[in-house]
Amino acid sequence: MTLTLTPGAATLAQLQDIWANNRAVTLCPSAHAGIKAAQALVAKAAAGDDAVYGVNTGFGKLASVKIAAKDVATLQRNLILSHCCGVGEPLDAATTRLMMVLKLLSLGRGASGVAMTTLEIIENMLARGVTPVIPSQGSVGASGDLAPLAHMAAAMIGEGEAVFEGTRMAAGDALRRAGITPIVLGAKEGLALINGTQFSTACALVGLWGAWRNAATCVLTCALSTDAIMGSTAPLQDAIHTLRGHAGQIAVARAQRALMAGSQIRESHVEGDTRVQDPYCIRCQPQVTGAAMDILHFAGRTLEIEANAVTDNPLVLVEDELIVSGGNFHAEPVGFAADQIAVAVSELGAIAQRRVALMVDPTLSFDLPPFLTPDPGLNSGLMIAEVTTAALMSENKHLANPCTTDSTPTSANQEDHVSMAAHAARRLLRMNANLNVILGVEAMCGAQGIEFRAPLETSAPLKAAMAVLRAHVPTIAEDRYMAPSIEAASALVANGTLAACVDLPAFVKGEAA
């Protein structure tokens, strides 16, 4: 199904649908008039004698070099080819397509001066499944994501590589097989295509969606862990959290309380429990996961604005009949958002790992067997699974260090402060993958611990979640080859199956709380 988007008004839900479901898109026809008006203004400037950056001049430090009218098309083509300097593993197809959609939205605002045919080829490539090969490294996030977007633009002119029908090939061949004619770039069009933050923003959005899913999963895995160690639900009382007032904290406490309602395990120790308080990793779950959710919402709002933004340079101001240079290509907002997401992901993993450590330690787990195995000594149980989570937690802590603070001058000091947003956003994929494993192992430990509490039963919602887990990860009755079980549990986190067990629809969908 083709989704019609209005430039400036795309929602995170629409963008997530496009990314997850391989949607084709088209721009709302109401955007066409503004696009054409801006292109006419650029054409007028290209035919004139005045130097206009990006239209009839060189680029960056070479902006003072005037280009003859007869060389304008060559200028744009040379720009694309010279900027195809990306390295590293290719960006995955879904994120590449999302990047193309974001570029379409930006150009569709009518402030870039490109021809309708340039937007139409992006629409056609999305509809017919021609996906440019985009090396994932090489952008410093100002002047936009130059290298990765140049590889996208190269495919549009029949250069570089693309994937079509599952096969990587020359982009010209891919376009031909899809029945698409490569475009010839007009004045400013090459610059409009590569100036922008769409690579960084696409990667950050994917990281955001993964973090939202993991935050919801964290509520479930903590509920399992809490019942496994016979923890208290008293700290989940609504009055505690409304007194503080943070929306995320309130929502997490309510959701976890609902997950644990009716647990026989919990009811068995409401009275007479010798423990006064649970460790922070149990007791402060709403405060930590709730804070993570709140910061994810803040980052999400930033990225939604950026997804609809014009981040080209120079900008075509049709009403004022001006083409003006600015700095909207600087991806600092995206870099900040990605750094915020990284901190949230790291903290979700840090507190979850402590719950795993709690459950496998017989001195802390309230009479659970060592390493959650029925025959400790002969069997090691989940001993090294916990060590794996510690390794991944530490890795994520390192990856959470801010990237935006690491600016370096480039391009002969013309571009002397950069955002590093691309790196900030890309590392989120690895961090979420690590967190998937930590939460998968926590789910395994929590379920195993609850089973040791028999004949007492957990709540109906947690039994349902355990049934989902047990369909893929059997109870660990004795030592076995563990890697497939960890992989299966992690997959249930990554694909959202466990998150779906939690009643946090607003957060899972990325809507305001």
Curated annotation (Swiss-Prot):
Reaction equations catalysed: L-histidine = trans-urocanate + NH4(+)
Location(s) in or outside the cell: Cytoplasm
E.C. number(s) listed in UniProt: 4.3.1.3
Record pathway: Amino-acid degradation; L-histidine degradation into L-glutamate; N-formimidoyl-L-glutamate from L-histidine: step 1/3
Entry keyword annotation includes Transmembrane: no
Gene Ontology cellular-component terms listed: cytoplasm
Keyword Glycosyltransferase in record: no
Gene Ontology terms: biological process: L-histidine catabolic process to glutamate and formamide; L-histidine catabolic process to glutamate and formate
Alphabetic keyword roster: Cytoplasm, Histidine metabolism, Lyase
CDD domains (alphabetical): PAL-HAL (cd00332)
Cross-link for 5-imidazolinone (Ala-Gly), residue positions: A142-G144
SUPFAM superfamilies reported in the protein's UniProt record: L-aspartase-like
Post-translational modification note: Contains an active site 4-methylidene-imidazol-5-one (MIO), which is formed autocatalytically by cyclization and dehydration of residues Ala-Ser-Gly.
Coiled-coil region: none
Pfam families for this protein: Lyase_aromatic (PF00221)
Gene Ontology MF: a single term: histidine ammonia-lyase activity
Modified residues (2,3-didehydroalanine (Ser)): S143
Alphabetical list of NCBIfam families matching this protein: hutH, PRK09367.1
Similarity comment text for this entry: Belongs to the PAL/histidase family.
Protein name (Swiss-Prot/TrEMBL): Histidine ammonia-lyase
